[in-house]
């Protein structure tokens, strides 16, 4: 488009500009301000018209942002590309997403997945370098050539405008109105006459018209629009030659541009064919490599799956064998149990038949046998008890004879074997076990002559009596002289005849002990000796221990003998 901008005052051109794209005409009327008439003397000044200031126009409303279809399509395309690429990238990391992509057969998913998995920045750079090397020989018109062509067209347009401007005159019609009336009168717009002669338009040949670039066609259309605005009636006929030369130049320019375009297309087609052949061969090689890799992977996966399936099949076969074997064992066991039950039932029925027939009196015989068994068991228990009782009594009698009345001419013997034998015999009775438990410590280290008899205890007491008499005469805290005096004075004491029951002196105690030993009352004699006080009690301590030992042995043996009679 060619634009011409002009400011016209008195129908003359003030500013003119021509660009390579458009020409625009703008004309504005210059307002002529006339001075007010000078009033002469004696005359009234003319009334001045009241000028109202123009009202302030409100600011224009803000322009609303219009809907852009191109922006909407661009954003939608970018969003879809990001979602699609993210889905394919997630498919390489997740098997479920991969199954979704394969099942739905998304477009170009195989090529894009291969590019994501095997592609790299080096491969992308290599592909760009190959494209640059293939299309580098194709020569496009440079920016300088396009600018030069545009400048030529601009200069030719300026020349045409200058030639036409010389013939172009504008007439201005005056007016008889006063300045005040001119101010009050509105701006009049003159209508353009329709019947205006025009210059001949620029036209291309029919051969070039179909192959000329769209930009050239738009430039020619702009020139034609400009030519139509020029009034041909005021121009000389010699300008027709100028228009014809311009038409011829534009035709030559279009033909050259068409030739360049055709040569560029031919060269581009050749390069595309060569690149297509190379890409097809590389694609074939890549396809063969991928096929081999896929076959290798398929074979490997197949072998792994076969191994896993064989292992799983062997496990299932082994489990089935175990289950079948166990089921067979259970079935055989159940059959055996059932056969055993049937056999027992059959034997029971046969026994019942025999019992009801020839063995009708078998129950009575069985009852008699039961009674006989009970009698035999009771008799056997009684025999065992009597035998046990006899053995215990014999052992107790043997111990008594050895301990309480040993023979003077016999050698001393250990009592422990007799006590152990008695313990074995009386192992089932609790009373005997407790008695033997107390008797064993007493007799474990004793012999047949270590337990003193009543006569031996009496003779020892008689030997101890002088020492007791002398000890009773000792004063408290006596020294050597006190001991000698007690020995002398004890010789002077006369023995007491008879027994004094309530006497507390030493002679009464000695007499009661001797009397009790003579009667065989050892427990009374030991009690009297144990009640002594002071030094006399210490002197009689050994005799009291021996007496108590004999009393304990006699008591335990008597308890064992009594319990053996009760058994």
Curated annotation (Swiss-Prot):
GO biological process, one term: cristae formation
Role summary: Component of the MICOS complex, a large protein complex of the mitochondrial inner membrane that plays crucial roles in the maintenance of crista junctions, inner membrane architecture, and formation of contact sites to the outer membrane. Plays a role in keeping cristae membranes connected to the inner boundary membrane. Also promotes protein import via the mitochondrial intermembrane space assembly (MIA) pathway.
Pfam family, one: Mitofilin
PANTHER family: MICOS COMPLEX SUBUNIT MIC60, MITOFILIN
Mitochondrial matrix domain ranges by topology: 26-68
Lineage per the UniProt record: Eukaryota, Fungi, Dikarya, Ascomycota, Saccharomycotina
Coiled coil: 284-383
Major site of localization recorded for this protein: mitochondrion
Sequence similarity: Belongs to the MICOS complex subunit Mic60 family.
Gene: MIC60
Protein name as it appears in the record: MICOS complex subunit MIC60
Membrane topology: Single-pass membrane protein
Matching InterPro entries: MIC60
Subcellular location: Mitochondrion inner membrane
Keywords assigned by UniProt, alphabetized: Coiled coil, Membrane, Mitochondrion, Mitochondrion inner membrane, Transit peptide, Transmembrane, Transmembrane helix
Subunit details: Component of the mitochondrial contact site and cristae organizing system (MICOS) complex.
Sequence intervals crossing the membrane: 69-91
Source organism (scientific name): Candida tropicalis (strain ATCC MYA-3404 / T1) (Yeast)
Superkingdom as given in the UniProt entry: Eukaryota
Residues exposed to the Mitochondrial intermembrane side: 92-567
GO CC annotations, alphabetized: MICOS complex
Residue spans of biased composition, Pro residues class: 36-62
Transit peptide residue numbers: 1-25
Region Disordered, residue ranges: 36-63
